[in-house]
Amino acid sequence: MLRVEQLSKSFGQVEAIKDITVEFAQGEFNCIVGPSGCGKTTLLKCLSGLMPPTGGRVALDGVTVTRPPKQMALVFQDYSRSLFPWMTVRQNVAFPLRNKGLAKSEITRLVEEAVEAVGLTHAIDRYPWQLSGGMQQRTSIARAIAYQPEILLMDEPFASVDAQTRANLEDLMLSIKARYGMTILFVTHDIDESVYLGDRIVVLSSSPTVVQEILTVPLPVARDQITTKEDPQFLHLRSHVFREIMAAQAG
C-alpha cells in the first residue's frame, strides 16, 4: 500500500502542491491527470523519493519514503535520454539488476522475460540508435519490469510517440498489468488514455494542487482500442474528466 498523507511541496514562496492525501492499493492502475503545470511531475517525484516534500509524507507499507525505494521503478517521458546509447537492449535492461546480488543466470532470465513481455526479443542485441522511438520506450519499460518493482511510476511515457505507437503501447501496459500485477501510477495529459488504462483516475486541481476528484473506471478489465472507446461508459467518463479539468483550469 502506498499512502500519501497531507503532502505539500513549495519552491521558495511558490506553493506547487498544497495538500494531497490519497492511497494506492496493490495491483491498481491509477492514472493521474490535471491541468498543465498543476504539479503532476512534482507529485511523482515526491512519491518516488527523488524530491523531499515540504510537508506531510509518503509511506510505502507504513514506512516513510525518504529516498527511492527498492520496490519502485520509474519510466520517464524522454526515453532517448534514459537509455545508454553504447549498450544493447539486453545490456540496458540488465543494468539496474547488477547490484541486486542475483546470479548471472537469474539476471539473464529476468531480462529475457521482460524483453519478451514488451515484444522486443527480435531486437534484444540492437543498440538504441537502431530502434524506433516506440521500441526505445519499450526498452525503458522492459528495464523497469525486469527490476520486479511492486510499484511502477510512469511520467507521461507516451507523450513523444505517434498515435499508432501510442495505442500499441497502451495495450502493452494493459498486458503488463495483467501479467505482473504491479501497482501502476501513470501521469498523462491524454484524457482518453486515462480512461482506457485506469482502474482509477486521480484528477488534480490547478496549482497549488489538491486532489479534485478520484474516479473509479467502471469498464471491463479486458479492453481494446475500438470496442472500449465506443462504449457509452467510456464516452461518459471521458466527458466527465474533461469537464473536471476545464473547471480546474478556470479556477
Residue ranges, per PLM feature:
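A short, proline-enriched helix->beta-strand linker immediately N-terminal to the Walker B motif
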Residues: A146-E150
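Conserved ABC transporter NBD signature motif
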Residues: G56-P68
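Catalytic Walker B motif of ABC-type/P-loop ATPase nucleotide-binding domains
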Residues: L152-D155
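Helix-to-loop junction immediately C-terminal to a conserved catalytic motif
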Residues: S48
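Conserved ABC ATPase signature
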Residues: Y127-L131, M135
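The feature captures the beta-strand-to-loop junction immediately N-terminal to the Walker
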Residues: V33-P35
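Conserved ABC ATPase "signature" region
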Residues: R98, S105-A123, S175
